[in-house]
């Protein structure tokens, strides 16, 4: 099965109106590439503004959401609100949510289930820390994080898995093409065993972790790497080269 290439841009807590305008300008000026799903995730205050300015071929995602539609949850946003803005995607389980904000596998799984039930597609992030990799626990950590949503019986057609080795996020260190492909292959084998061969074949598994215009082409050639989740590089014009890494 041919899986459509997916490139996400996670702006994290960066930007203002002027910088959003700058990013919109270079994205709107880029040649349309219908062979790639392009989704960018601005900070919550700029979601509606970015959506109003971006061309039709670039979708907008939220960076996070909570597990219920509304209520006394100060500072949170819900999938219902994301949908009300006309958006289709949310990023969940990012390592910064797990490690800076203490989100557990169980909470992330609940949030994922609720987002999917509300009609929002999910970029579901997993990944190991450096000490976990060095201790030989890469497979265990990633499988544990995935098992949390497998146990919930989620529907997989609206999930993209983002493998982001924590030791490579924002550090300038990148997993080699071989290291990334190895883990992506393990993830696909896990889906085949725990869910179904059809889901394993159809689910897009994208790589994140210091992806740049320089390394994207090599990573994009690997058979189980179906795209990228890009951090800092998505704020710069070179992001267009990453979008077109397979072209």
Swiss-Prot record:
InterPro entries: Aldolase_TIM (IPR013785), TIM_sf (IPR035990), TrioseP_Isoase_bac/euk (IPR022896), Triosephosphate_isomerase (IPR000652), Triosephosphate_isomerase_AS (IPR020861). Pathway: Carbohydrate biosynthesis; gluconeogenesis; Carbohydrate degradation; glycolysis; D-glyceraldehyde 3-phosphate from glycerone phosphate: step 1/1. The active site is at 94 (electrophile), 164 (proton acceptor). It catalyses: D-glyceraldehyde 3-phosphate = dihydroxyacetone phosphate; dihydroxyacetone phosphate = methylglyoxal + phosphate. Substrate binds at residues 10, 12. Its EC number is 5.3.1.1, 4.2.3.3. It holds the Pfam family TIM. Its main location: cytoplasm. GO terms for biological process: cell redox homeostasis; determination of adult lifespan; gluconeogenesis; glyceraldehyde-3-phosphate biosynthetic process; glycerol catabolic process; glycolytic process. It comes from the Eukaryota. Homodimer. PANTHER family: TRIOSEPHOSPHATE ISOMERASE. NCBIfam families: tim. Belongs to the triosephosphate isomerase family. This is Triosephosphate isomerase. It comes from Caenorhabditis elegans.
